[in-house]
Amino acid sequence: MKHVIIGMAGHVDHGKTELVKALTGVDTDRLAEEKKRGITIDLGFARLDFPDGSCASIVDVPGHERFIKNMLAGAGGVDLAMLVVAADEGFMPQTVEHLDILQLLGVKGGLIVLTKADLVDEDWLNMLEEDVKSRVKGTFLEDKPILRTSVRTGEGVEALREALHDLTLHAEEKSARTPFRLPIDRVFSVDGFGTIVTGTLIDGHIAVGDEAQLMPLGNQCRVRNLQVHGRDVSAVYAGQRAAVNLAGIKKESISRGDVLCRTDSMQPSLMLDVKLQNLPDSKRIIESGSRLHLYHGAAVRLAKAVLLDRDALRPGESCYAQLRLSEALAARQGDCFVVRFYSPLETVGGGVILDEHPYRHKRNDARVIASLAVRESGSDEAKLVQAVGERGADGMTLADLAACFDEPEEKPVEMLAVLCARGKLVEIAPSRYLISSTLDRLWTDCETMLTKYHREHPLHAGMRLAEARQRLLRGKARENADAILACFAREGKLTLTAEHCALADFSVHLTKRQSAIREELLRTCRAAGILGKKQDALCALFDKKDRMECARVLESLLSTGELVLLAPELCVEKSVLDAVDARVKAWFETHDTLMLGEFRDALGTSRDHALLVLEYYDRRGILRREGDVRRLGAQFGEIEK
């Protein structure tokens, strides 16, 4: 079922609340002060039922200038707008400001209602309609229906209901795939239930029992119960007004403007890259460095507007800007916002968020401007390439891209294939992509690193993988580093083993004397069996003049894996250790555990030396010690290779 929010807008005392009551039977003025003063101060909500069983939610917002802050809190989740104009007064200052706000917030559909039609004659109504048409020209309400109503006589109320029903049927359906997000416009507690927050779910869906997080502080909580218009429900979907009963958090820890979201789905930010617009009828020039009030969802923040390509933004102009906030804010790319002048407090503009987690930019940086232009209006392919490129060596998975563009995973697959074929992207591992220029830069770094290593260690088989990962991709996940190195190997640029990496054209070249030393070292270690030989003892086999060469050859044999360090300084020849591996494997084919005494007898060696070998297997993860016995370790499969 499609869920739609209809927002009321218009000047104070133009009949918005009375119109909602006529449509729904609900008096949205819930505060005693509202009843006393006869004006709406805070947000009111009502359910509008249609004859076919469908419904919509109506948000009644205050029209008085002093309560624009509250109006903005309710306008954030609006799908359709009802701009209310009293027939006896016409367009007024808050009518204009509300229309500007709805336009800035990206509302696409709606209609105009002339209330109190019974107070004026037909000629006046016709003249007012023409005036309204001229005032909404160029806005989302241009050419939209204008309906005449009177709640006192009932004129036009049913026609309005039918028009609203038709609009809801054609309203754009919201995605339920993105993680849920609910900007909080009200928080209170109820005896026996605890903390309750209300708001419009603008993304995804939320269910009873879901774990949730409150941003920007990041406090954890759980959804205990859900209501939509006073009725208990098991789940709420994007486009519905909801009351959410939260467990695990107190009312005092939550403020209006906080965002309830799926755990770990959002991160707060102190900076936003935006496309900023100064309204055509604004009386103010927004200079770079100006302080503004930023309204996003139900939140308000002070912001410093840093204009990225000019010194001042004049009425009717727009530009890229970075908003630097006084307090952290949880937002998403594509969100709309409104800005009001710092003092005097008046609406001057707004825009759309292009990057919710930017770096701090310098002004007049052409690369930044070009990047933001792609974010704003680039092709899907350009946006995809840029999104991958911004992740650097981390790259992006297919799932990341689908979430980023709010599409099922099947959608980007064809585009990714085309971009890979064009050489824009590289699939470094199944469903993980890197931008080609990033991979080229990494290869240049890798080639430089290994060339230097081979020059300094000509007898080594290559750099140890752990060292290569750390030096080339500092701080990156091992899985991603291995995928990049494997990609270089597939391209024929690298030689990879389980322990080392080397340039593809590198090989160890021994002198005649080094070759003789190598053979003697291997023969001696092979003869020593599992007891092995200490490195000092091996070097002592040679004259003093050859001991330096012996140390180099030993290092080479250890790097190639022909010799293995069983313990510090203790070398064992690989074929000897392979034979012990085979015994261990055979043992565990018929046993669940291995005791030290059993292993000692199998090797025919001392208890101390058998323990030394077992500890070597423990370190490799091949075996795992539990008390006095060993069991199979997580890496046992290595000895089967």
Report the location of each language-model feature:
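Residue-level signature of catalytic and energy-coupling elements of molecular machines
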Residues: D13, L19, G38, D60, ...
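C-terminal effector modules of nucleic-acid-centric enzymes and ribosome-associated factors
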Residues: M8, V120-W124, S134, I249-L565, ...
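Residue-level recognition of beta-strand microenvironments
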Residues: H11, V187, G204, L226, ...
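Alpha-helical scaffold elements adjacent to nucleotide-binding pockets in ATP/GTP-utilizing enzyme cores
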Residues: L19-A22, Q94-I101, M127-R135, A159-L167
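Conserved catalytic-core segments of large NTP-driven translation/proteostasis enzymes
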Residues: A117, D123, S134-S282
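Conserved G1/Walker A P-loop phosphate-binding module
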Residues: M1-V61, E65
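Conserved nucleotide-binding/hydrolysis micro-motifs of P-loop NTPases
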Residues: H64-E65, D88-M92, V107, K116-D121, ...
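Conserved Switch II/interswitch segment of TRAFAC-class P-loop GTPases
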Residues: C55, V61-R66, G76-M127
